[in-house]
């Protein structure tokens, strides 16, 4: 899972 915009 990712909570950043640059995944």
Swiss-Prot record:
Modification Cysteine amide, positions: 7
Subcellular location per the Swiss-Prot or TrEMBL entry: Secreted
6'-bromotryptophan carried by residues: 6
Distribution of this protein across tissues and organs: Expressed by the venom duct.
Residues annotated with Pyrrolidone carboxylic acid modification: 1
Disulfide bond residue pairs: 2-7
Annotated GO MF terms: toxin activity
Any one of the GO CC terms: extracellular region
UniProt KW keywords: Amidation, Bromination, Disulfide bond, Pyrrolidone carboxylic acid, Secreted, Toxin
Function: Does not elicit gross behavioral symptoms when injected centrally or peripherally in mice.
Comment text on domains: The cysteine framework is C-C.
Name under which the protein is recorded: Bromoheptapeptide Im
């Amino acid at each position: 899972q990712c909570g950043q915009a640059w995944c």
